[in-house]
Amino acid sequence: MAQEEMEVDLLNLLNPMYSNRDVSTSHQPRGSGQVLFLPPPLTYSDDSEDLFLGPTEPHDVIVLDSVEEAPGQVAAPTNALQMLHSALEQLRQAAEQRSSVRPTRVQRRSTRRHQRGGSQRTAGTSSRAALSNFFQINRTQGVAPTSEREERNAALRTESSRTSPGDSSDETVELSEEEEGGGGSSTDVDEVDINAGAAPPAEPAPEELQINVIEVQAEAPESLPVPESVTLPLQIQKKQKTPVKQLSPVKHLPPEEDEGDTCAICFEPWTNAGQHRLSALRCGHLFGFTCIERWLKGGAAKCPQCNKKAKRADIVVLYARTLKALDTSEQERMKSSLEMEQSMRRKAELESAQCRLQVQVLTDECGKLRKQIQELKMLIAQHGTSTSMQASSSRSTISGSLSSSQGQHKYSFEKAILISQTGSCRVMSYCESMSCLVVSQPSPQTTLIPGCGIKKLSAANLKSSQYVPIHSKQIRGLAFSNRSDGLLLSAALDNTIKLTSLMTNTVVQTYNTGRPVWSCCWCSDNSNYVYAGLINGSVLVYDLRDTSNCVQELVPLGSRCPVVSLSYVPRAASEVFPCGGVLVGTLEGACFWEMKDDQYRPHVLPLEPGGCTDIQIESNTRHCLVTYRPGKNHNYVRGVMMELTSNRLNDSEDEYSCSCYPVQTFNAGNTCKLLTKNAIFQSPERDGTILVCAGDEASNSAMLWHSGNGTLLQKLQADQPVLDICPMEVNQSSMLATLTEKMIKIYKWE
């Protein structure tokens, strides 16, 4: 059984005395004796086994005379201390008696008496009285006898000794006071339930005893106040040890889950709403909004984690329910491996293309050698020469063929023709059916015939014939069809494309494009269609049978840069690239528009972004030449020969995915201020070799390269930058024309 403590509130015992003393002294005249009221004795009832406070008796009042306090200063405090000791002894005995009895309920009764002319005061009102005033005792008054109280206390001890320690009966202790007056009274009863557990005999549980003064009622008579009874309720409280409550263990998240959900300042989880919502600084570190706001206001204008400078305006609230870092290391590793594989694949494709080109050249040489061998055998059979003569002639023939195949021929200067004294020549084109070379130029007589036109040159005698006016502004493109009617397609900055007949030197058809035209070309598969490349990147498709508007517009997929070149790739029975369509070159890249059943499907070619100035096509071998101006990665003009390829989509026989890859690179000077046009064509030797010719502004020349090994074969000098290059066949002779702003130079292959 838990031990119980008993506490005696001495101050509450003395408060009623102070209160009565104050009441009495306030009504007596000056110089009279002081009256001291002592608490009534505690009595025990044998019938009800309750404790009662004894009635107020006359001997409990001690009158203190201030006049005689000098002679009795020694004896008076002694009597008062004896009375106080007697009262405390009674309380101790009552507590010992009640320790053997296990009360379960204590009834407290507070009685209020209403007397005529009286006033009610609580015990707390006189607690401020000095303790020294209590011990002013008058020697004339005797001490109240205590014989009756001692007898009652002895009876209480005898009764408590008869009570068994193991008795489990419940007892009720009632503390009451008797009423002396005849006035009405009201009684309030408060019941307090006390649970008492059985205690072992060896360890009795002490009880805590508190004596509180409930009420003091005083009646003030005319001469001397007569105090009412002082009620001292006895409250017995039992203290039991409360069992320790088992707290639920705190759940801790694993470090990998906890670290991503807590604020780095307060180490509390952030929320998706409220003041502690998820926020971030400009450096990217995450905190609770209130924490980082207080951190920055406190003078530390830096990130708590990386110490970068920060301010309150840098706080960004993130709207996220959960925040988890996605592990992309495997994805990045796969990307790097994919890029490595793609680079190796491009390198392998480049080597494969070079090998195929070399195989083609060697195959052609082998065919020629076999043909020569057959001719030699026929000659030997006809003339019947000896074996030695056959061997010597065979060796001489083979050595001659090898010397010719090694490229001993070259272009030699033939003639220079002045086109315009004022310059501004831009492009040229050759009509093979009429052996006519046309060059764009401004009008030689601007006052009579303003605008721009073309000058016709005869390739047979290399003489200029006449000027034909066509456009009102500068001409940017010229193209002939594969028909023999001599129709010239021209594009100019006056928002028109025109068809001009070289037979009559007149314009036969005009189409208004609405925007400046930078390039044009014919459709090789169907000569009724022509294409016009505009300044906004679009390509307009015109049908010569429809003289009003365009039949279709090819809108660019990417940027709207001007179309600097247009070339048509005809269909061919080739496994490498059987598709036909128009190749569109802009300042940002290239796109191949595949034509099938009068419908066009775009294929973006993988070229280097930016810096593209021209794209030319060699339709027989499906190669194209892309010219790049100097940039950040390269400080010189580059010409890259690309091979067009196609792959079937989803095992379909009609759908292809078109692309290209580089085969050879040619480097020129470090200056490129003009949009020049270059040329890629087959060698005049007819051995399958491809030659590349491009202008070099730094040296004012045209450079000729061998595409197989990338070697520079020849450098054709000019007095100005070369703007356009045109190879042509005249009377079974191969010739090359280079155009500057004022003149044309003709070179012949010898």
Swiss-Prot record:
Residue ranges of the region described as Disordered: 92-206, 387-406
Gene3D superfamilies linked? YVTN repeat-like/Quinoprotein amine dehydrogenase, Zinc/RING finger domain, C3HC4 (zinc finger)
Question: What Pfam families does this protein map onto?
Answer: WD40_RFWD3 (PF23419), zf-RING_2 (PF13639)
Predominant cellular place of this UniProt entry's protein: nucleus
How is the cofactor bound here? Binds 1 [4Fe-4S] cluster.
Catalytic activity reported: S-ubiquitinyl-[E2 ubiquitin-conjugating enzyme]-L-cysteine + [acceptor protein]-L-lysine = [E2 ubiquitin-conjugating enzyme]-L-cysteine + N(6)-ubiquitinyl-[acceptor protein]-L-lysine
- Location within or outside the cell: Nucleus; Nucleus, PML body; Cytoplasm
EC number from the UniProt entry = 2.3.2.27
- InterPro entries on file: RFWD3, WD40/YVTN_repeat-like_dom_sf, WD40_repeat_dom_sf, WD40_RFWD3, WD40_rpt, Znf_RING, Znf_RING/FYVE/PHD
Start and stop residues of the WD repeats: 470-510, 512-552, 558-603
UniProt lists compositionally biased (Acidic residues) regions at 168-181
**Zn finger spans (RING-type):** 263-307
Q: Report the GO terms under cellular component.
A: cytoplasm; PML body
An annotated GO BP: protein ubiquitination
Q: In which pathway does it act?
A: Protein modification; protein ubiquitination
Q: Where is the composition biased (Low complexity)?
A: 387-405
Q: Which UniProt keywords apply?
A: Cytoplasm, DNA damage, DNA repair, Metal-binding, Nucleus, Repeat, Transferase, Ubl conjugation pathway, WD repeat, Zinc, Zinc-finger
In its UniProt entry, what is this protein called? Answer: E3 ubiquitin-protein ligase rfwd3.S
Q: What organism is listed for this UniProt entry?
A: Xenopus laevis
